[in-house]
């Protein structure tokens, strides 16, 4: 038996090599891997000695040789293949262990294009693909986490075709991921991220019980190990729908730096939000906006879930809590609640990945765009359109309302008062309907909107929403502007003594 080991990530390779040697494998290797194995007392043959061909062009050509690929690819059950191998002095290679040059790491650490190019692996992917193609005869490894499993399988004599097939699938996933990252990087560098092809690659974190509905299959995939690093289940497991709501709630609650923000989300839309002097007060005021919709919702906490906050949340049924951190006494509060799910990021405040791009599936393909964000200076740079200016407190509320609106399904309007959302209308086909629905819900909840502010994620096409806002005492409004009837909207604001700001930036969300 013969194994070829050539790895960039050398974690566990010495131990793996020793185990293979003990199992009777002859070991071939290259470069740094060869040196490391030899230094650790493993009998190893350098590939250039095996092929009788030197490494060429500063190591660019090492393993691209018929004796390597012939040794991997020839079928052991095909008499013609065996005959050709003997005629050409090609010896079988039964195990290939390769992981690739750290291209991604290099792009993160350096902008030197020559260095980046040199970290595109050629021989490694070729060997992995060859071994994967001939999986019926050859084992292929590209992940150090598989070393122990492979050794145990070999020791137990369970190296069957099904075992090798699973390694084969993983190998092709590995090379596809590698090539996709290279192609995306080149398009990002030279085509602004929008090249002729776009590759979206995720790593599976876990299967969900089902998808959006029980008859659908679902799973969570991640970019750059974000969930593995920042998502820990403390109580129960997240469903498919939980994950989408957690995403919406976390994105909103984490958008205010270190502020004690609480967001309550139901079916992807916020039904409560507040920033008060502490998290307990934030939760109390967030819940007031729509305590009916909050039932069975997701609560995101930009800080630590402690016992006091846990007791307050425990007064109603919420399905999910996602908190930056959770203390033990808080967990104890929910000990007898079987249905609640609790997750933490184990950090002082909530963490977002800030993905640069966003995509949505459409029938037959997907649309792809830069991710939307409310700029830090968006309100600061907004143009005052009215005669009246907003007060300092109103400006704080306008910023909160703006950010909530950006994370809410269009068409939407958001009313905020003293740091808390007091009304919201979302997902409506007309903006005036969103405005009216929000006011109706606020009245149902017994909330006083007098003195609140209003934000809209897109322009008001008519003055009717301003007229409605005046009836409940709105004092300041922020919107993008851009309607052919902007003059009518400005006139209405001045009639009612409102402050009106145009940001020039729309935040549709579909």
Curated annotation (Swiss-Prot):
<dbReference type="GO" id="GO:0004643">
    <property type="term" value="F:phosphoribosylaminoimidazolecarboxamide formyltransferase activity"/>
</dbReference>
<feature type="domain" description="MGS-like">
    <location>
        <begin position="1"/>
        <end position="142"/>
    </location>
</feature>
<dbReference type="InterPro" id="IPR011607">
    <property type="entry name" value="MGS-like_dom"/>
</dbReference>
<keyword id="KW-0658">Purine biosynthesis</keyword>
<dbReference type="InterPro" id="IPR016193">
    <property type="entry name" value="Cytidine_deaminase-like"/>
</dbReference>
<comment type="pathway">
    <text>Purine metabolism; IMP biosynthesis via de novo pathway; 5-formamido-1-(5-phospho-D-ribosyl)imidazole-4-carboxamide from 5-amino-1-(5-phospho-D-ribosyl)imidazole-4-carboxamide (10-formyl THF route): step 1/1.</text>
</comment>
<dbReference type="InterPro" id="IPR002695">
    <property type="entry name" value="PurH-like"/>
</dbReference>
<keyword id="KW-0511">Multifunctional enzyme</keyword>
<dbReference type="GO" id="GO:0006189">
    <property type="term" value="P:'de novo' IMP biosynthetic process"/>
</dbReference>
<comment type="similarity">
    <text>Belongs to the PurH family.</text>
</comment>
<protein>
    <recommendedName>
        <fullName>Bifunctional purine biosynthesis protein PurH</fullName>
        <ecNumber>2.1.2.3</ecNumber>
        <ecNumber>3.5.4.10</ecNumber>
    </recommendedName>
</protein>
<dbReference type="Pfam" id="PF02142">
    <property type="entry name" value="MGS"/>
</dbReference>
<keyword id="KW-0808">Transferase</keyword>
<dbReference type="InterPro" id="IPR024051">
    <property type="entry name" value="AICAR_Tfase_dup_dom_sf"/>
</dbReference>
<comment type="pathway">
    <text>Purine metabolism; IMP biosynthesis via de novo pathway; IMP from 5-formamido-1-(5-phospho-D-ribosyl)imidazole-4-carboxamide: step 1/1.</text>
</comment>
<dbReference type="Pfam" id="PF01808">
    <property type="entry name" value="AICARFT_IMPCHas"/>
</dbReference>
<dbReference type="InterPro" id="IPR036914">
    <property type="entry name" value="MGS-like_dom_sf"/>
</dbReference>
<dbReference type="GO" id="GO:0005829">
    <property type="term" value="C:cytosol"/>
</dbReference>
<keyword id="KW-0378">Hydrolase</keyword>
<dbReference type="GO" id="GO:0003937">
    <property type="term" value="F:IMP cyclohydrolase activity"/>
</dbReference>
